[in-house]
Amino acid sequence: MKLFGTSGIRMKNLDPLIAYKVGYAISKNFKKAVIGRDTRTTGNLIESAITAGLLNGGCDVTTIGMVPTPVLGYSAKDYDLGIMITASHNPPEYNGIKLFNKNGTAFDPKQEKELENIINNDDFNEGTWDNIGCVIEDKTAVKNYSEYILQNLDIKTNFNVVVDCANAAGCVVSPNIFTEAGCKVISVNSHCDGRFVGRMPEPNEKNLKETVDIIKGLNSNCRNYIGIAHDGDADRMIAIDELGRVTDFDKLLAAFCKYIVQKTGADKIVTTVDASMAIDEYLNEFGAEVVRTKIGDVAVAEELEKTGAIFGGEPSGTWIHRDIHLTPDGILSGLRVLEMMEFYDKKLHEIIDEVPSYYNMREKILCPDNLKQQVMDYVSKEGEKIFEKKPETLDGVRFSFEKGWILIRPSGTESYVRVRVEAKEKDFAEKLMKTGISMVYTGISGN
């Protein structure tokens, strides 16, 4: 049975028996674990089940309660591994399990496959009375994380910030840490509720409408509030500028990459194959290299360690600040957006408006999982003929041009093939998208 996807285990109505087996499998190779959970109603259930498996296999467990993923990832340094019970931005009926190494990086596919093999092949014998693990409760994890982050910040301006936590795990950290950083904070959806009563945890324009309206109302009196909004486990963030605009993920990432290079003198940054070419355009001016990797925080973290770059980010709002820690951190990212504003002495909307605007198009096409490889093989061969270019196959199939690019990639969690296009001219973007869609459909049909 395949359990792990592109971001750990994530399922609708996650079975506690699966959680138990995961815990028992972990105990085969790890004897000291720290575990946390987000606000989902099934969090206690899944945590209890995975803890039972760990204990049965002789693994000692420290529970740190309801915390964001960055707190869990930071805490993992004192243990053999960290276990986060979360389904991130998914609706409340979902839950999941994401595993972290001591250095804060998420488990890679090889590590997950090893666990999967144990789960699928082990007989799950009962532990003996003299080899059962123990449980310890630690209530200092949030405090320790917050103190560490604040020690590494450089913010002198008292910013006005609306913090939207989605009734999720960010509630226990974000409002307080922004306040301690000197901000005047207005909290929205900041009480923990695993039903996500205020909004769904995906921080997109549709879900953030009420928060946008609040910011527009506040700024009608020239108060210059910006917004920071999280997903379900606060490993991501998106910003809302003073004009009440939910910032474009690509533009915010490009602006921040430029800031990192200008402030630190960094000679490279890491991003993914689906990130905007605005990043390349921005950083070429400073002679900095853009290193692209597969989509996903695991790949970004691996490349950061390999290249020594201090920052890596995805255009989903998943950013890793290697100079602080290697876990994706939406709380730290939000605070560093404020650092960027202070560095430039500009409002957020002014910084974002300086980023080049390109034509972006996205489509997803239904495709049975068993046909995905057939489609990608066809796209690679046919695309090379049509575009007269060798395909880039780091993650999916990408063709790059002077004025744009197209990426065709199978979804790792759904029965779709995704087509992403970016171009400097609208006509070229539409032409690329039309060609991409046609290739995918032909690949599905097998003709």
From Swiss-Prot:
Belongs to the phosphohexose mutase family. GO terms for molecular function: magnesium ion binding; phosphoglucosamine mutase activity. The gene is glmM. It catalyses: alpha-D-glucosamine 1-phosphate = D-glucosamine 6-phosphate. Its EC number is 5.4.2.10. Binds 1 Mg(2+) ion per subunit. The active site is at 88 (phosphoserine intermediate). Keywords: Isomerase, Magnesium, Metal-binding, Phosphoprotein. It comes from Methanococcus maripaludis (strain C5 / ATCC BAA-1333). Its cofactor is Mg(2+). Transmembrane segments: none annotated. Mg(2+) binds at residues 88, 231, 233, 235. It is an enzyme of class 5 (isomerase). This is Phosphoglucosamine mutase. Activated by phosphorylation.
